[in-house]
Design a protein with these regions (language model features):
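Short, Lys/Arg-enriched N-terminal segments with co-localized hydrophobic residues
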Residues: 1-12
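Extended two-metal-dependent nuclease catalytic cores across DNA- and RNA-processing enzymes
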Residues: 9, 15, 39-42, 92-269, ...
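Low-complexity, acidic/Ser/Thr- and charged residue-rich accessory regions of DNA metabolism proteins
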Residues: 13-17, 246-250, 259-310
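Domain-level signal for Mg2+-assisted phosphodiester chemistry and nucleotide/NA-binding surfaces
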Residues: 13-118
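Short helix/loop capping segments that flank catalytic or ligand/cofactor-binding pockets
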Residues: 29-30, 157, 299-300
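Electropositive phosphate-/nucleotide-binding environments in soluble metabolic enzymes
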Residues: 49-52, 102, 125, 254, ...
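Generic domain-boundary/flexible-linker signal
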Residues: 82-84, 156, 271
Length: 310
């Protein structure tokens, strides 16, 4: 079900609500949510369209539920960032992006253009850094912020003004992280969530962490010592063990991992909150895009909703 009425409003929202979407990871989730139907999702030109379709469904669901006054979809600009300059193997070893997914990316951006949604990328930075920077700017300006991603890196940004939603299953199921929920689930604060990643590493991003420290051990250390810094301040008092030996040997690696895992909230972005006002789609061109993609049901729903609004 697609809720087109939700994005055909005229933007007259009383409350300032910012929706920030990690475009690359959400698109990837959309691709695999409909992967079993990959061959069914092709347009007349032979383009695979499952990621585009799934991304549209996710957007429609979020727009209807969040009702943002402002919105941005952030993308990664490329594989080279300030983090790869710091650690060449960062995100190394990832599997090749499927061609069926790669070919859809330009059309996801085109979809956003027709929907009237701003998208942005910044050389040398990741989508997370763009999101983190705008999140802090929006907090200072009195916004309520919803961040949506396909992975958990952005959980570190949750606070009293910011909810971080992680895509779980399909195109409409999300797990919402607030500071209270994070404490309830893991016993950690958002700042400690970064330290946990520094300790245990992250295989998906190829962040090394400390040898043989997993989630359970990492949480135990943080509950005892408060932070990564606290662990090393108290390490001399720890009883002799293989874990202590690994912590000592991998100290430099642990602090490098923390730097790699920490989102930059002061990225030199060239856009501001005033550029992110959402006032709805270009219905005519969005309809033409649906025709090109072969999205008959979406086109029909768009026509019905736009007629009702008119």
């Amino acid at each position: 079900m697609v809720f087109f009425d939700s994005f055909l409003y005229n933007g007259c929202m009383d409350k300032k609500k910012l929706l920030l979407i990690d475009g690359s990871s959400v698109a990837f989730r959309a691709f695999f949510a409909l992967y079993q139907q990959l061959d069914r999702f092709k347009n007349a030109a032979g383009l695979h369209t499952n990621a585009i379709y799934g991304f549209q469904l996710m957007l429609s669901h979020l727009l209807e539920r969040v009702e943002p006054s402002h919105i941005l979809v952030a993308f990664d600009a490329g594989k080279t960032t300030f983090r790869t300059e710091m650690y060449a193997d960062y995100k190394g070893g990832r599997a090749k992006t499927p061609d069926e997914f790669r070919e859809q990316f330009p059309f996801i951006r085109e979809l956003l253009d027709h929907m009237g949604i701003r998208h942005y990328e910044l050389a040398q930075y990741e989508a997370d850094d763009i999101i983190g920077t705008l999140d802090k700017l929006a907090e200072q300006d009195g916004f309520d912020i919803t961040i949506v991603s396909g992975d958990k890196d952005l959980i570190q940004l949750t606070d009293e003004h910011t909810v971080v939603e992680i895509s779980k299953k399909g195109v409409a199921e999300f797990e919402a992280f607030t500071p209270d929920y994070l404490m309830e689930e893991m016993g950690l604060t958002p700042a400690q969530f970064i330290d946990l990643k520094a300790l245990m590493g992250d295989k998906s991003d190829n962040i090394p962490g400390v040898t043989k420290v997993g989630e359970k051990t990492g949480i135990k250390l943080l509950l005892e010592h408060g932070s990564l810094e606290g662990i090393y301040e108290n390490i001399d008092g720890m009883k002799t063990s293989k874990m202590k030996e690994n912590l000592i040997n991998d100290k430099e690696q642990a602090f490098l991992s923390k730097t790699l895992a920490t989102i930059d909230t002061k990225a030199p972005i060239a856009i501001g909150l005033e550029d992110l006002v959402y006032s709805g789609p270009d219905v005519e061109n969005l309809g033409k895009f649906y025709d090109e993609m072969g999205f008959k049901q979406l086109k029909q729903a768009l026509n019905v909703s736009s007629a009702d609004v008119a």
